[in-house]
Amino acid sequence: MTAQEFGEWQGAALEEYARDVASARGIPLEDARRIARESHRLFLPEGTATTGVHLVVGEDSDGARVGILWLGPNPDGAGPAWIYDIEVLETRRGEGWGRALMIEAERLAREDGHTEIGLNVFGSNAVARRLYESLGYAAASIQMRKPL
């Protein structure tokens, strides 16, 4: 991922993550934006030069961007490699690009010496959950909430 691609991706990724957090937690969008910014500061402190991080731009055979993958060390500092973000352009969904990016994440994680890979998925994202389950991912923990 080039510096220009990183800048474009990061702005969109922060906003999308903030909207997901706001929806999942029932918090104001501005609070969720602060959480998203802090997450990126913590896990991407050096941008594309952050040690152990892979930022992959998925491209089709014509070189057109179809999606991105952010893979890095586990947030806890130990354990499996971690998929922080995977995004396929809305116009390219359903064509197998999400699966291809997930397979690339697994390849990169193995190359880095990992024997396990993990991710978080919002409970409302049924399409992503089906993809992950079809690739052999299983729930390790489930967080539940109820508004009062």
Across the structure, where does each feature detected by a protein language model lie?
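Residue-level detector of anion-binding/catalytic polar loops
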Residues: 115-116, 138
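Acetyl-CoA-dependent GNAT
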Residues: 3-89, 104, 108, 139-148
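Conserved acetyl-CoA-binding loop-helix of GNAT-fold acetyltransferases
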Residues: 85-88, 94-111, 130-134
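Residue-level signal for the short linker/turn that defines the boundary of a DNA-recognition helix
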Residues: 81, 114, 126-127
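Conserved hydrophobic beta-strand within the GNAT/NAT acetyltransferase core sheet
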Residues: 83-86, 117-121
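Conserved active-site alpha-helix within GNAT-family acetyltransferase domains
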Residues: 99-103, 123-141, 146-148
